[in-house]
């Protein structure tokens, strides 16, 4: 009666009660119902009804086919189990005593009856599958001539060094020669006007003095130290003039030092900075004190600005070479392209000449590529020191471009990304307003250079000489006359750190590092002036030419 399992039925008992549910089991003795619902509203999971109590049965729903098949499988399994439990097992009637009297089974003798060699030989003869089509053939490593170690030119960009680096100078010279006739005509007009308006004797006239007081001092220093060649008759007169200029310089330094001491911001009162490695307190200097050090070095020790310039370039180049990877990367056998350094310079005998000398030491060995962009055209350079350093720089392999667009187009043809930008437009002896003057062309050019520099992101580091562009070297505050400024990540200090760095840290969030570079000022120079004696007892550059500062 298993075929009725799962049927929904309504059972009427002899006492008149009605019960609904699904048949879970049906036998001759009665029914077992699931999901039972009584006539009075009661419910139960299971309920058994004896056959003697049944009066009537009504089928409400029929069981599903899947339920029937499942029930049939269960019934078949039950039948098979019952058969296995029957009397049909052949070994259960064996006599155990007879089995014990039999000999032990000889595995070795029966194994010898099977000739494995002939069987496997026959299987191999009948096997027509190629070895490479088998599974083991697919997993086997292909035999090929392969070296254990890679060469230095493998797994790199092919011909990475073969780009348009050597073509930059030729394109630049063509554009320079094309603009030379027009520029010469403009220079002639400017010279004619200047000859009428400017006279060397008017050096003390306030009308012809530079805008800033720092440029006044620079102007006096060059007038005193860079005098033209003279004969014996006028030698005494020139010496007297030189003494007068130096006397005026001393008075100006004293007056400006007093004014700076009373006008410095509150955050600028700290006059020392700590070394990152030695934790030594290093005194900080004002721009006037740095100029005074150079003047004393030239006057008392006969070390001119060219010698100081060369010392700075050598020590700063060693520091930047370490930043670019050092000896592990800077090798001629390296198949990767050389790192690229971009210099933004001005026609300044300090910042511009320093940057060019530094670029020369970086590129003269062929390990580093250096491109320079001036705030003016190359044929408009006027400072003799900058012109001299430019010629040497070009002979040593440095490149010069005349515009930001030329710089960008040159970078697109090179396999070397820009890794370091050297900001040398301003320096500590002038401002961007002084560089631009009244020329809107130069001002626009400087702004485009600053904009390009600030767009360099990622691993590109921007190192400014002494002070970033757009900040005042005396106070470290943003220049109120020139709103654009460079977001430098590091500062290269010449000789001594400027006291303006204290305010610069708060006004320049991108600033991360600062390094002090030895320019070769003798220790005895600090004892010549009372204001410089605080620099005399510092052991900075004993074995190295650079020293990291803790900002």
Swiss-Prot record:
Pfam families: FDF (PF09532), YjeF_N (PF03853). One of its GO terms (molecular function) is mRNA binding. Residues 288-527 form the YjeF N-terminal domain. SUPFAM superfamilies: YjeF N-terminal domain-like. Transmembrane segments: none annotated. The modification Phosphoserine is found at residues 257, 261. PROSITE patterns: DFDF, SM, YJEF_N. The keyword Phosphoprotein applies. It is found in: Cytoplasm, P-body. Residues 1-63 form the Sm domain. Its main location: cytoplasm. One of its GO terms (cellular component) is nucleus. One of its GO terms (biological process) is positive regulation of nuclear-transcribed mRNA catabolic process, deadenylation-dependent decay. It comes from the Eukaryota. PANTHER family: ENHANCER OF MRNA-DECAPPING PROTEIN 3. Homodimer. Interacts with DCP2. Belongs to the EDC3 family. Stimulates decapping of both stable and unstable mRNA during mRNA decay. Does not affect nonsense-mediated mRNA decay. Required for normal P-body assembly. Present with 2340 molecules/cell in log phase SD medium. This is Enhancer of mRNA-decapping protein 3. It comes from Saccharomyces cerevisiae (strain ATCC 204508 / S288c) (Baker's yeast).
């Amino acid at each position: 009666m298993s075929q009725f399992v799962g049927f929904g039925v309504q059972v009427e008992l002899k006492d008149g009660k009605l019960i609904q549910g699904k048949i879970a089991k049906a036998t001759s003795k009665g029914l077992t119902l699931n999901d039972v619902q009584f006539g009075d509203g009661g419910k139960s999971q299971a309920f058994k009804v004896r056959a003697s109590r049944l009066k009537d049965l009504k089928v409400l729903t029929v069981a599903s086919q899947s339920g029937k098949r499942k029930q049939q499988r269960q019934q078949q399994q039950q039948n098979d189990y019952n058969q296995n439990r029957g009397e049909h097992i052949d070994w259960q009637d064996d006599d155990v005593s007879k089995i014990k009297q039999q000999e032990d089974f000889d595995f070795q003798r029966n194994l010898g009856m099977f000739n494995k060699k002939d069987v496997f030989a026959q299987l191999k003869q009948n096997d027509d599958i190629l070895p490479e089509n088998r599974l083991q053939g697919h997993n086997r490593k292909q035999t090929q001539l392969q070296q254990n170690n890679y060469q230095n030119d493998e797994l790199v960009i092919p011909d990475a060094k073969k780009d348009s680096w050597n073509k930059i100078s030729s394109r630049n010279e063509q554009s320079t020669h094309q603009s030379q006739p027009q520029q010469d005509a403009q220079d002639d007009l400017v010279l004619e006007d200047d000859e009428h308006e400017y006279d060397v004797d008017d050096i003390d006239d306030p009308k012809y003095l530079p805008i800033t007081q720092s440029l006044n001092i620079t102007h006096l220093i060059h007038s005193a130290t860079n005098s033209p060649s003279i004969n014996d008759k006028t030698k005494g007169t020139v010496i007297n003039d030189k003494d007068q200029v130096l006397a005026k310089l001393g008075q100006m330094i004293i007056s400006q030092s007093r004014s700076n001491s009373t006008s410095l911001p509150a955050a600028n009162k700290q006059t020392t900075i700590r070394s990152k490695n030695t934790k030594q307190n290093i005194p900080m200097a004002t721009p006037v004190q740095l100029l005074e050090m150079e003047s004393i070095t030239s006057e008392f020790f006969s070390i001119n600005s060219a010698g100081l310039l060369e010392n700075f370039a050598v020590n700063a180049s060693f520091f930047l070479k370490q930043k670019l990877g050092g000896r592990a990367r800077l090798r001629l056998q390296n198949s990767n392209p050389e790192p690229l350094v971009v210099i933004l310079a001005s026609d300044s005998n300090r910042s511009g000449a320093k940057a060019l000398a530094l670029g020369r030491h970086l590129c003269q060995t062929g390990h580093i590529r250096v491109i320079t962009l001036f705030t003016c055209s190359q044929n408009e350079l006027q400072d003799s020191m900058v012109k001299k350093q430019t010629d040497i720089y070009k002979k040593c392999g440095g490149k010069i471009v005349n515009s930001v667009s030329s710089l960008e187009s040159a970078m697109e043809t090179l396999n070397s990304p820009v890794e370091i930008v050297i900001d040398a437009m301003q320096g500590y002896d002038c401002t961007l307003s002084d560089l631009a003057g009244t020329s809107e062309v130069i001002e626009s050019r400087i702004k485009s250079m600053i904009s390009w520099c600030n767009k360099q992101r990622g691993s590109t580091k921007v190192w400014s000489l002494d002070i970033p562009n757009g900040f005042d070297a005396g106070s470290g505050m943003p220049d109120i006359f020139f709103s654009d400024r460079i977001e430098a990540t590091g500062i290269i200090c010449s000789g001594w750190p400027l006291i303006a760095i204290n305010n610069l840290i708060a006004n320049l969030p991108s600033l991360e590092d600062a390094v002090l570079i030895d320019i070769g000022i003798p220790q005895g120079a600090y004892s010549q002036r009372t204001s410089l004696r605080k620099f005399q007892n510092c052991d900075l550059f004993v074995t190295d030419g650079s020293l990291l500062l803790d900002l």
